[in-house]
From Swiss-Prot:
Example of a GO cellular component annotation carried by this entry: cytosol
UniProt-listed Gene3D superfamilies: P-loop containing nucleotide triphosphate hydrolases
GO biological process: dTDP biosynthetic process; dTTP biosynthetic process; dUDP biosynthetic process
Name the UniProt record assigns to this protein: Thymidylate kinase
Reactions that this protein is recorded to catalyse: dTMP + ATP = dTDP + ADP
Organism: Rhodopseudomonas palustris (strain BisB18)
Name of one Pfam family that matches: Thymidylate_kin
Length: 230
């Protein structure tokens, strides 16, 4: 449970984002981390982008189906991502953090930088402007970037969806995914205080152990100790 401050207000929660290419295992690792945190009596909210709120989920369908890219190209699609994020942040993320919950989010602004910035040739000025409008001063306390070789990630994604049609990003070329992987690795190198790059080319449990170690080291060590001795 979230602890209360002396004036009765809940201590603000922590914001953890998970990033990586297709088939990196983000959804699986988020669920496993939530289980560990819940076991330590830390309340969690699991969410995702694009989507995460009713309005943003509608926009998610437009983006992943390819409808968004037909409206006005890459820049118009970036505006759709921004609209979805604005709704998501103000209706889900910020309220949950204010109530003391820890928010675990499958993709956030780094995905915009990687997909729309690196791949779509969207001007950095537009990306920065959209970020200021949609999230203000909100930043993840920790970003886990799951790194996996492209061929393995694409194969995992294909096995996961089965007979379903790939979404517009899954259907991109291997070269697209290679550049995307490098974009994420560069983000991790540029912001080591926020980001932890984890080799996800392994079984689920060893990767989960690395994620848990990163959370303990960066955010949770003193809190876990307090919970264990409560």
């Amino acid at each position: 449970m979230a602890k209360d401050t002396p004036n009765g207000a809940a201590t603000r929660g922590r914001f953890i984002t998970f990033e990586g290419g297709e088939g990196a295992g983000k959804s699986t690792q988020i669920k496993l981390l939530a289980e560990r945190l819940n076991a330590g009596r830390i309340r969690c909210v699991l969410t995702r982008e694009p989507g995460g709120s009713p309005g943003a989920e509608i926009i998610r369908h437009m983006i992943l189906s390819g409808i968004g890219s037909l409206i006005g190209g890459t820049e118009a699609e970036t505006l759709l991502f921004a609209a979805a994020r604005d709704d998501h942040v103000h209706t889900v993320i910020e309220p949950a953090l204010a109530q003391g919950s820890w928010v675990l989010c499958d993709r956030f602004t780094d995905s915009t930088r990687a997909y729309q910035g690196q791949m779509g040739a969207v001007a950095p000025a537009l990306l920065n402007a959209m970020q200021r409008v949609t999230i203000g001063d909100l930043k993840p306390d920790l970003t886990i970037i799951l790194d996996v070789p492209v061929e393995i990630g694409v194969k995992r994604a294909r096995l996961r969806r089965g007979a379903a049609e790939p979404d517009r990003f899954e259907a991109e070329s291997l070269e697209f995914h290679r550049k995307l992987r490098e974009a994420y690795r560069q983000i991790a190198a540029d912001e080591p205080q926020r980001c932890v790059l984890i080799d996800a080319n392994a079984k689920v449990k060893p990767v989960a152990a690395k994620v848990w170690a990163a959370v303990q080291k960066r955010l949770l060590y003193s809190k876990v100790s307090a919970v264990q001795h409560a």
